[in-house]
């Protein structure tokens, strides 16, 4: 069972429908106990970093996510959810994050030929093969964001070219993040979610 975390700042239903489509049993929940009992967790997110982190903390879900990460169960952060996995953000003001992947969230550079927000389809360049990125080099995914993950190169598994080389996907052990929206990226997005399904089943089998 995959639990999609509901903390009033994410597009939970579209992610749930995408998981339904690939046959991955899932549930939307804000209950810490249900989330802790999941085989894997997806942290969605849209909106502003400070408000999202504040809401996670208010519900006690920041601690829940850190506890789940420590068990080795897979976590996938999507869009703002990916950014929350990092150590901090300077969006509006300095805000501490979950600290599950080293790095900081910064605003995309504004240049005449590159609009902010970065919105639309962009091509993935795979930097490191993982179950989520295999055979996806050169494929297109859908982005909507104004901030990006500035993190050490060893944690970046896929990028897209823009005003800078945007980290499209990041990874630290059992923790994964996608800056783009897999649930809005057609068949390629479904392949990424299938990769998360594979990681989840593999982890569950190893822990039994």
UniProtKB/Swiss-Prot annotation:
Q: In what residue span(s) does the Glutamine amidotransferase type-1 domain sit?
A: 1-206
Pfam families according to UniProt: GATase
A Gene Ontology biological process term: L-histidine biosynthetic process
Arranged from A to Z, the UniProt key words for this protein are: Amino-acid biosynthesis, Cytoplasm, Glutamine amidotransferase, Histidine biosynthesis, Hydrolase, Lyase
Catalysed reaction per UniProt?
5-[(5-phospho-1-deoxy-D-ribulos-1-ylimino)methylamino]-1-(5-phospho-beta-D-ribosyl)imidazole-4-carboxamide + L-glutamine = D-erythro-1-(imidazol-4-yl)glycerol 3-phosphate + 5-amino-1-(5-phospho-beta-D-ribosyl)imidazole-4-carboxamide + L-glutamate + H(+); L-glutamine + H2O = L-glutamate + NH4(+)
Molecular function (GO) terms for this protein are: glutaminase activity; imidazoleglycerol-phosphate synthase activity; lyase activity
Q: In which pathway does it act?
A: Amino-acid biosynthesis; L-histidine biosynthesis; L-histidine from 5-phospho-alpha-D-ribose 1-diphosphate: step 5/9
What are its GO cellular component terms? cytoplasm
Cellular localization per UniProt: Cytoplasm
**Entry's EC annotation:** 4.3.2.10, 3.5.1.2
Instruction: Identify the catalytic residues.
Output: 79 (nucleophile), 181, 183
Cite the Gene3D superfamilies for this sequence.
Answer: 3.40.50.880
What is known about what this protein does? IGPS catalyzes the conversion of PRFAR and glutamine to IGP, AICAR and glutamate. The HisH subunit catalyzes the hydrolysis of glutamine to glutamate and ammonia as part of the synthesis of IGP and AICAR. The resulting ammonia molecule is channeled to the active site of HisF.
> How is the quaternary structure described?
Heterodimer of HisH and HisF.
Per its UniProt record, what PANTHER family does this chain match? Answer: IMIDAZOLE GLYCEROL PHOSPHATE SYNTHASE SUBUNIT HISH
Q: What is this protein called?
A: Imidazole glycerol phosphate synthase subunit HisH
Q: Which organism is it from?
A: Listeria monocytogenes serotype 4a (strain HCC23)
